[in-house]
Amino acid sequence: MSNRLRKITKATIQNDLITLRVNDAGQIEHLSMKDGPNVIARPTGLFRAILKTGENWEDVVFADRQWLNVSVSGHSVLISCDKLRTRDGERGIALRLTIRLEGDRLVFESMVSNSSESTLNEWIYPCLGTIDTLSGGKPDLLYPKHLGEKIKNISEYLRGRTDRDATHEISHAYPCPLSMQWMLLEDSGTCLYLSGRDTLFYTSALRARGSKEGGVTLEMNKMAFVKPGETWECPAYLAWLYEGSWMQGAREYALWAASWRTPVTPRDWVKKMNGCFLVINRQQYGDENWPYDTLPALYDFAKAHGFDTLGLYGWYQNGHDGSRPGPKVSLSLGGEKTLKENIKKVQGKGGRVTLYFQGRLMDTGSDFYRETGRKIESKTRWGTPYYEYDDKYCHSDYLHYFSKKPFAAVCPSCEEWHELMARHADWVYSLGADAILYDHLGGMTPYPCFDESHPHLMDKPSLSHAQGRLRVHKKIREQAERSETCAYMTGNVTDAHSQFPDCLYCAGSFPGIKGTGTSLPVAGDAALGNTESPGPMIMPDLFRFTFPQTLITIRNPNPSVSRRLANFALLYGFKLEMELRNFTDKEFILDDEGNEDRLYSRQLARLRSAHGDYLLEGRFLAQEGLTNGNEQVKAALFERADGCKAAVLWNDTDEDQPVSLSLEGARWNSWASPEEEGSGIPALIKPQGAMLIYEA
């Protein structure tokens, strides 16, 4: 629509802290702090919408093609339109948008009234940009993929993304693989924080959109599915332009999350746990490596690595990822009596035992699926299940390439599944296990379910997943609480789901390229150690600082723990993990390979236990208030219950590095590494060394 048809309007709201101006096209053309520069380089459309009209699932609404009314009321900008226009015509859908100034924050609210025959499937609002710089530099994007990433020079990174499926943009779903509903631009001490305020946890997406010209726009997408005749109010969003650190944004998000997130207090033994020694007793393809009577010997291997918990996968009749969700105790592995006896033997040695169950997928060849699963599976828009495939193999190319076992994802809104998960938890506890490990319940793809016979909240496909899963968590937690010591663990990390388990496994984070922390997929200068090169870097601090009391293991599908992985886990407060998954791993452990790694892992576990008030039960503070004069040495703070702080250091290089660390008020006079300890603060930290600096 040409500008000559618009009523020219400039809507400005401001106070002593923030100025915002919206033009007649509904674009934010000015956003600044008091006396600061305008961070909007080129205004962009404030919203988009994706409609389903007839058989067209991409009937797109662009903000700059609408006839908008823009006005000011007090400290709010009001934007409205009575009809939406797409390239195919006019739709009877009305919008009412509000941008409200609250102190130094901006609150974005919106309402959609649908009197058309279309369904508004996706509502993309707000779109904040285009931003070239916040304070003269090249902004980095802090993005909550898994535990967190920092994407250096996000504008240049997006400019270089020319692949067909993600041209000049990144976008992922929440909840999972995104762990939180906030992201942040950081530029030389200036931050722009954008956060969702969605306590229903709609299936959503967070996008950073660039272009071949550069710049970045931050966007939020809510999968709304607003049907004909429905009026829908979108959960609010909050934007905050401020001077300071990303940690202020994290604290703001944590404060809001405290209004709905009530995490359990983990069992004492889980808090003090150093690591999980995972074993697949029987594989999907039928190979049996570890009968039940080998559990005490397996625990001895675990102790040799400094681990205190034995986690059993594939302990049931059909093997790991064999028959989901209804396994039986394996007769060929020894039967129920032998399983119970050997669990007790491990516990008699001071160990703990967890038993694995699948919490989300159903084997399409199982009796359960044929009798019940078809009714409760999550359905696509075509009415078919959401299929996933899994292959397990060791030496066989056939199993690797041509034996993908199909599974159907359950719709977690179905009560039948809640009851089944609770019964399975009861059964596992009756076998004498200390914990049940329910796979996938902490996250995984939040599929919208289109089976209208299921009891989805508000009849929304996008509320079928998270809302149903929250009820599953509560059911399982009820079973665990019947005992004073039984624990509940699950995989994957999200803010919504991490409040129920005692511990999460499979952190989705790893050390990255040595000396840089750069993610492995990044090539070019980043792979050579140039950390200024555009691209993603691992930043587990993002989730760990926001929710420091959440206990997490570091995913490690290998039969040993490398020195770098152990140091990485120490730095970020992850519990260790390793896995024996096939016959090759069995040979590795029986042949006594990996001696150096095993010794170091055991020494590191002793260090953690000796200083467990910091390293196992303390609060992770990232680098808050810490001055580190050597960026080659990674550092993080931990706070124990009495408020004292200690620092963990890791030299992820191949050379000695000087230690230059200070914290106001700290009286550090001692240090300890996995191999040795001493007084004072050492001048150097050795290559691939880690240490704790603390007050004795």
Give the predicted meaning of each segment.
Residues 8-11, 18, 31-33, 38-86, ...:
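Polysaccharide-binding surfaces and accessory modules of carbohydrate-active proteins
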Residues 83-85, 89, 118-126, 148-370, ...:
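Conserved structural scaffold segments of CAZyme catalytic domains across common CAZy folds
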Residues 202-216, 669-684:
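Solvent-exposed beta-strand/loop surfaces of large extracellular or lumenal domains
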Residues 678-696:
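C-terminal beta-strand-rich structural cap/linker in extracellular carbohydrate-active enzymes
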